Amino acid sequence: MFFFHKIVIPIIIGIIQGITEFFPVSSTGHMIIFIDWLDIKNKDTKILEIFVQLGSTISVFLFFYKKIIQILQLPMQKESNEKKNIHVLISILPTMFLGLIFYNKIKSLFNPTNVMYALILGGFFLIIAEKFKPKKPKTNSIKEINLVQSLIIGCFQTLCLYPGFSRSGASIAIATLLGFKRSVAVNFSFIISIPLIAGASVLDLIKNIQNVNMLNIPYLFSGFTISFIISFLLIKKFITILNKVSLTFFGIYRFLIAGIIYFI
């Protein structure tokens, strides 16, 4: 049992996080389901979820760091870049604000039943976005994103606070409805995910730091490492898939997982 809990579990959870992070299917929801099914929910797995999310977030940062630097630096085109900074800030503020205020309530929702409901609702949202998106994209680069679009994306992104809804699912779906080219919606979604997930992970870690000790550090580090490696090696391939595959496919996948939760 020691081998299973301390070695196999962090590897599996790291793989789950590393794969599902890049699709609009809720990586958090998948981890909640897996941990509940194996009946292994405890202080260690709670901390492990934080570490594996940090692993995939760092891989996203490394993949997008050139685009992030272009947004954050203020060279000759100062006004333009400041504008981009504001866009990113506006897109993350609603979720940060509500996440801080309702932190304890949000954490109380972390169970398979709530994940099932969120998977279904999020699935419908993805299918609706695919069906009713503008025939021709109106926003073809991150530079073209305006403040109103950023605010709308930020508001809809708060749906991810309900476990299982999917942050990328909410942001990509609403961006698609707003007329974003798919690659722009995907890139912007992942760029604004970095400060959100990093901030949420740090907050979770601070609130649970008492559960980190010398005995579980190897366990946590192995989950972090697996998540980072899987994410880093596959991110380019996964984003290519996400740019090409219909959102309806992911909506149907979410329905299937919700059905499995219901019947099992």
From Swiss-Prot:
The annotated topology with respect to the bilayer is: Multi-pass membrane protein
Q: Which HAMAP family match?
A: Undec_diphosphatase (MF_01006)
GO molecular function ontology, one term from the record:
undecaprenyl-diphosphatase activity
Q: Which residues cross the membrane?
A: 7-27, 45-65, 86-106, 109-129, 145-165, 186-206, 215-235, 244-264
User: What keywords does the record list, in alphabetical order?
Assistant: Antibiotic resistance, Cell membrane, Cell shape, Cell wall biogenesis/degradation, Hydrolase, Membrane, Peptidoglycan synthesis, Transmembrane, Transmembrane helix
Note the InterPro entries from the entry: UppP
- What is a biological process (GO) this protein takes part in? regulation of cell shape
Where can this protein be found? Cell membrane
* Gene Ontology terms: cellular component: plasma membrane
Report the family membership: Belongs to the UppP family.
Name of the protein in question: Undecaprenyl-diphosphatase
- On whether Protein biosynthesis is a keyword of this UniProt record, the answer is no
The record makes one more remark, namely: Bacitracin is thought to be involved in the inhibition of peptidoglycan synthesis by sequestering undecaprenyl diphosphate, thereby reducing the pool of lipid carrier available.
- Where primarily located? membrane
Question: Reaction(s) catalyzed by this protein?
Answer: di-trans,octa-cis-undecaprenyl diphosphate + H2O = di-trans,octa-cis-undecaprenyl phosphate + phosphate + H(+)
Q: What does this protein do?
A: Catalyzes the dephosphorylation of undecaprenyl diphosphate (UPP). Confers resistance to bacitracin.
- Write down the Pfam families for this protein, in alphabetical order: BacA
